[in-house]
Amino acid sequence: MNLYNTQCPVPKEQQPVHEYTSLKNSWFFCWPTLSRRSYNKKITIALLLNCLLVSPILLSIFPITKLPLKFFFSEFITSSLMTGFILIRLYLGWSYVVKRLMSATVFYEESGWYDGQIWVKPSEILLKDRFIGLYEVFPLLNKIKNTLSFLSLMISGPVLLFFYF
């Protein structure tokens, strides 16, 4: 029996559990739910696509024949920053959902922006939502944070070398 259907006045698309499942099933936000290998593959593909995207622009700024090191460093830095923005977007989406899952109250709108309501979760629903938040979503947030940390460490070397050369 779904507790949300019987006890909850919140519209289905605004219920925290529904938001969690819709994120988990979406094309982009499902990346952290994949296995470590598949997740790393997606991030690497995003990094390589960003490299291809910024190469023509950076070639016009740093000609590869005259400034090859500046070109390669700037390409790596720029594509890594763009990949970092992708990871930040993933993090923000999942952190919004975990905040709604962990909260004892749910803010919702019945028909528009002018009639917002607050619903206090019953203890059964609160326990279920917090369980999902702690054991399903927090590990995903940690995975994204670790990837962002690794990416920022990888960027630090080329940034210093960019200004040296």
Curated annotation (Swiss-Prot):
Task: Reply yes or no: does the keyword tRNA-binding apply.
Answer: no
> Which parts pass through the membrane?
none
According to its UniProt record, where is this protein located? Answer: Plastid, Chloroplast
Q: One GO term of the cellular component aspect? A: chloroplast
Give the matching Pfam families: CGLD27-like
Keyword annotations of the record: Chloroplast, Plastid
Q: What family does this belong to?
A: Belongs to the ycf36 family.
Protein name stated in the entry: Uncharacterized protein ycf36
